[in-house]
Amino acid sequence: MTFACSIPIRVTSELPTDLGGIPLSVEVDFGRAIRDAGLQGVFDPNSITVVNVVSGRVNPHARTEDFAYADAGRVEWVIQNPAHRDYEIRFQTAARRPPLLPQDFVPAIGNGDLLRYNAGTPRPIPLCYAMRLVDLTGDGKPDLVGCWNYYHRPGSPVSGVVCYPRVGDDFTFGDLMRLRYVERTGSREFQHFPGIYVEADFADFNGDGRVDIVFAESRKQEVTFYLNSGECDPGGQPIFVKDATIPAPVGLVSGLCAVDLDGDGVLDLVVNGHFVRNENPCGWPFMPSAPVDLGIGKRLTFIDMDGDGRLDALGLPAEGCGQALTWRRNLGGLAFGPEEPVDGGLPGDCTLVAASSDGDRRGVLVQHNAFQNVSFYELAGCAGGRPRLERQGLAQSLSAVVCLSDQAWPCACDWDGDGVMDLLVGGGYGWPRIVLNRGSNARPAYEPPELILSEGAPIRILRDELLFSEHWHNMGYSYPVFVDWDGDGLGDLMLPNETNRIVWYRNIGTPTHPQFGPRRFLGVEGYPDSPERRAASGRLATADNPYPKDDGVPFFWRTGAAFADWNGDGLMDFITHDETRKATLFAQYRDGGGRLRLRKQGHVRLVDGREIDDAIVGRAKHWTESFRAVDWDGDGLMDLIYSLAATGRIYLLRNVGSAQTPVFDLPREFRCFGQPTGFTIHGPNPWAGDWDGDGKPDLLGCVEWSVYPFFCHAALEMDRPPACQVSAMTWRMI
């Protein structure tokens, strides 16, 4: 017996008419509504629709992550017309709660929700550290589990142990959800796994046939076991109970593997490349021996590659991007042979590997493409002593969140001249990329990211290459902007970055097919530069101070720039920090021969006369800032968006001067419906502009692993969210 149910929603607060679309987020306990009505059956979370009662049309909506764990959560949509106040949330009951399926389209709401591909076809999903395929829900389908790192959607827990539930027969999955634990059996006080840099593995440690978790938090010399209780939360996810903690040689991002390495029938651990034997012949509780360094690396996984019955070791030669997967033959005991290559067309840029089985197919999960992708490779044989792996699937989801590796700061632009906004991003590992929108501005549909070429080769910006150095912090961290720098009518690629130089690539293509010439450095009058001078900057940086004072260079390290015509002469300028870490206007002009030149025009100031640095907002740690230009208030003057790492705060500095001489108002911290928006430590370096097409500028932020929280104009200007009245449910049998 199935019931069609409807819950009326009426917006009761006055709504502004001049702020564009307004997010509405309504918390509903569907399970309680069904119980209170005395209906048979349970809530079907996949059946939700939202109807605008005034227009009679279905409103696109989003569901919060809460529905992965319970029958209560938030349903979110955008009020496009403030005069439309009446809505209905419609849904159906089911005999049993079905698995939560991904939505085929999730609209941008604007209250910190995350940008999604919305391509109508599955797109890649990522994991940060640790990964396995295990059947957590008992439906016979291996789910993709592992760890997240740092922040995700604003307001959600940091890092943690996560799962993408399997939703089909192919290698496709649902939305990311978090695994939770309780302190004692029977408790329902759910907790999230602690820490920022964390490791986990998944196996049946106590022999009850259920998947348990072993977990490590970096810098703690211990691991903790969390046993699967056999009970589930209302969403059908297993409840884990915190159990024993044992000493282990944990290191920062070091690897944690549960494996019977010595073949005695019970699970051991390999932690940070050290073998920790389980001396309990019954397997549980785990009785650790003293750790033994295997001497073959840290991030290890084990699988019988050559069919001799012994578990061989797989790993990577070093940390970071650009590594090829290798294996070492098990020679018996704890001895392993030299590194050997693995056949099978594996990507050459692996960053993590984990032995896993997908049903009856044995193989490995491989993380690749600068941490962005996870693929399953099946072990397909071992001809001539050389094991071969065959790729069987790329982990994807129909509702995948756009996630583009380390600190890929965003810039929306019309890259290919088709009238719709694409997404240009930077990247911590040096590669700027373009994410093309094959949909419309009203309903974007994004392609996977593409590398950007210069003279036929992918553009990559790294500290050591620019500064001829060998520094431990050899990163890129570009803050890309696509803007017509040289006045020829074509957008050029501007790349402030990790260093105290700004590089750019001139567009030598067309408005619809951008192509880029060789790398150039922005030169400023009075600041001569050369390879020798750049090498001198590289030598200034020390291990403890990667961003030193460098008086001979006009720009500061790792700072984004606000490109606009700041002095009203029709030429492109920019504001960024100079070598003294003060916001400075760098202006272009034409010399007597008509050639474009760049000069340091001077520090810009607040209306009270102060120069602009992080002292105006009281930040204590001085690293990583960015500026963006946007006419936030629609008065025709370009304002300044200022964001800072460490706090993750974003500020508006209104231009209260003129188009020729900008002067900025005191900083106003952006808040989402009155609440602070600090949602990252290393960012957010937001892009500012009209993202949702309502004619009002918005903010698109970014977190460490480059998911993109979206804040619309109305949410940033209103002191509180719209109030609404949730009325009693009605229903009918169908």
Stretches found by the model and what they are:
Residues 1-114:
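Alpha-mannosidase-like glycoside hydrolase catalytic domains involved in N-glycan trimming
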Residues 102-125, 165-195, 227-251, 277-296, ...:
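Blade-edge motifs of beta-propeller repeat domains
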Residues 120-151:
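Beta-strand-rich domains and repeat architectures in extracellular enzymes and scaffolds
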Residues 128-136, 196-205, 253-261, 298-305, ...:
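Beta-propeller blade termini
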Residues 138-148, 207-217, 263-272, 307-316, ...:
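Acidic/hydrophobic-patterned starts of short beta strands in beta-sheet-rich repeat architectures
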Residues 149-154, 219-221, 276, 318-322, ...:
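Short glycine/acidic-enriched loop and turn motifs that connect beta-strands
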Residues 218-221, 244, 248-261, 265-276, ...:
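Solenoidal tandem-repeat scaffolds enriched in leucines and small polar residues
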Residues 423, 685-734:
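Blade-level signature of beta-propeller repeat domains, shared across WD40, Kelch, NHL, RCC1
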